[in-house]
A protein has these predicted regions:
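N-terminal secretory signal peptides that target proteins for export/translocation
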Residues: 1-3
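N-terminal mature-domain region immediately after signal-peptide cleavage
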Residues: 5-210, 224-225
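Short, well-structured alpha-helical segments that form the helix of a local strand-helix-strand
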Residues: 212-223
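Extended amphipathic alpha-helical segments with heptad-repeat/coiled-coil character used for oligomerization
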Residues: 229-263
Length: 263
């Protein structure tokens, strides 16, 4: 009887060790991502952090989960960034203004501000996707309840969602994009295309668009679901200075995408 119990315990121990090793191997690149987290400023409450995203993500897989509500959006983000672990996240809110100018050397500069009603730390997110363009983007850490992302394990895990909650960014081709809020009814397109949500649009453009026109075409190939009960538009510009305001026509029930060149 004792021999049988020992064998059972041994088998259970082996299974536990295999599970632990498998989990560690699966999360290795995510652990490295967390280890890259660095505090850039040193203020008392809210700070700037940076992080290198070293795990592979699949935007097409994320989209395939199906998005028709804020909860669908959150579930899709968590499935792609932190599978198997329970992490709390709230749908983000946005405000803001954006602009672009040409400097004295005719280089194109793009800027934006945040009109947040609450204070937040910011995370500079550096992504080098295998099949996409390198980019830097900013995420508001208050949106994932992680204003001090190095304070606990749960907050460190929460920052793994950062690639999919950025509010603006620029890629290696010079394409810049920012999301800005509107007071109109939230866009919920239902034309039969796959659906993306507000901040996923930013990640798609940064990873896959080399020009403003490519960004517009990319966004037009999906239905849009505006998150958090708000409506939004995007400001997109590229290295040539081609700037467009991309919005979804409030005067048409189908909410078709409209891209207006800046003057």
């Amino acid at each position: 009887m004792k021999k049988i119990l020992k064998r059972i315990l041994l088998v259970l121990l082996v299974l536990v060790l295999l599970a632990v090793c498998g989990f560690a191997a699966f999360y290795f690149s995510r652990i490295r991502t967390i280890q890259s987290l660095e505090k850039v400023t040193d203020y008392e409450d809210y700070n700037l952090y940076r992080m290198d995203v070293q795990y592979s993500y699949d935007l097409d897989r994320l989209i395939s989960y199906g998005i028709s509500s804020n909860q669908d959006m959150l579930d899709a983000i968590l499935k792609e960034s932190i599978p198997l672990l329970p992490i709390h996240m709230t749908a983000p809110n946005y405000g803001c203004s954006a602009f672009s100018i040409a400097d004295s050397d005719q280089e194109i500069l793009m800027g934006r501000n945040y009109d947040f009603k609450i204070d937040t730390s910011s995370l500079l997110v550096h992504c080098t996707p295998k099949d996409g363009y390198e980019s830097v983007a900013f995420a508001a850490l208050s949106n994932i309840s992680a204003n001090q992302p190095d304070a606990s394990l749960s907050k460190k895990l929460a920052v793994l969602t950062a690639p999919f909650i950025c509010l603006d960014g620029m890629n290696e081709k010079g394409v810049s994009i920012a999301v800005l809020t509107l007071d109109s009814e939230p866009t919920v397109q239902q034309t039969g295309k796959q659906t993306i949500f507000t901040t996923l649009a930013i990640r798609l453009v940064l990873d896959r668009a080399a020009t403003t026109q490519e960004a517009v075409d990319l966004l037009n190939s999906y239905d849009m679901f505006a998150t958090s009960g708000r409506d939004y538009h995007f400001y997109i510009t590229d290295a040539s200075g081609d700037g467009r305001v991309v919005e979804y026509d409030c005067d048409d029930p189908a909410r078709p995408l409209v891209a207006t060149p800046i003057r």
